[in-house]
């Protein structure tokens, strides 16, 4: 049975909660996308840079509210990294999904937000996108700096990796067959073109690459989330 995964979501939630799923009972097949979190404010916000937002946070501890799609999802991971690296006293507001989190920022219900690059790029006319939580700038937003360029040492651990998986115990020949076919399917010109037309970043990874990524995220998130629930 094929299923879709979203990392860091399922890994973070398996660390914090007593879930029935974790990286030990799932087998990755291949990865098709990697959608970074971006730091956004409303189009009428007085803040134009990460530095300006953090200066306001320093002067007003706890007053800078930042929305995200929920708890222990990519946006929340980006927030935790941002707060830790900047040392700022910030308040996270978990929404009931990415669309609601985006709406909060547009409506001025929160000072800022972390949201998907794909969704934010489609709503760019209603937002200011201050920074990307990734190791490099993105081709869809070439003028938007990374958080590291903005002086905050946040890496790519919150990037939403998306792909396909099967349950552990699936016959190895089935896993091998799917792993040999699925990444090629994701890389087809029509598929990549469709993703690009919706500002959905593609990142094609084979099974071995996904296994390595899962293990890296498991180790990092176990440390980041220690003591949180």
Role assignments for model-derived ranges:
Residues 1, 13-100, 147-149, 161-194:
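Hinge/capping helix and adjacent helix->loop/strand transition within the periplasmic-binding protein
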Residues 118-187, 216-219:
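C-terminal lobe and pocket-closing loops
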Residues 49, 108-109, 126, 151, ...:
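Conserved functional loop/turn residues at catalytic and ligand-binding sites
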Residues 183, 187, 191-212:
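Mature extracytoplasmic/periplasmic domains
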Residues 5, 69, 93-98, 115, ...:
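Conserved beta-strand termini and adjacent loop/short-helix elements that scaffold enzyme active sites
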Residues 100-101, 209:
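Short acidic active-site motifs
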Residues 206-229:
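Extracellular/periplasmic bilobal clamshell ligand-binding domains
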Residues 7-17, 76, 81-85, 107, ...:
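A ligand-binding cleft/hinge motif common to bilobed small-molecule-binding domains
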């Amino acid at each position: 049975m094929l299923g879709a995964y979203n990392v860091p979501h399922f890994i973070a939630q398996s660390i914090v909660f007593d879930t029935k799923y974790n990286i030990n009972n799932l087998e990755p097949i291949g990865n098709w996308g990697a959608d970074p979190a971006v730091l956004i404010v409303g189009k009428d916000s007085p803040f134009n840079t990460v530095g300006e937002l953090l200066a306001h946070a320093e002067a007003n501890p706890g007053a800078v509210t930042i929305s995200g799609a929920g708890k222990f999802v990519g946006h929340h991971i980006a927030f935790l990294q941002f707060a830790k690296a900047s040392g700022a006293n910030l308040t996270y507001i978990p929404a009931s999904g990415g669309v609601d989190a985006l709406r909060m920022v547009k409506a001025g219900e929160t000072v800022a937000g972390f949201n998907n690059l794909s969704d934010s790029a489609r709503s760019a006319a209603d937002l200011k996108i201050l920074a990307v939580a990734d190791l490099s700038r993105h081709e869809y937003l070439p003028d938007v700096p990374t958080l590291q360029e903005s002086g905050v040492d946040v890496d790519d651990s919150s990037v939403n990796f998306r792909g396909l998986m099967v349950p552990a115990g699936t016959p190895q020949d089935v896993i091998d067959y799917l792993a040999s076919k699925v990444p090629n399917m994701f890389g087809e010109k029509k598929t990549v073109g469709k993703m690009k037309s919706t500002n959905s970043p593609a990142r094609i990874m084979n099974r071995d690459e996904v296994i390595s990524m899962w293990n890296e995220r498991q180790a990092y998130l176990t440390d980041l989330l220690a003591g949180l629930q």
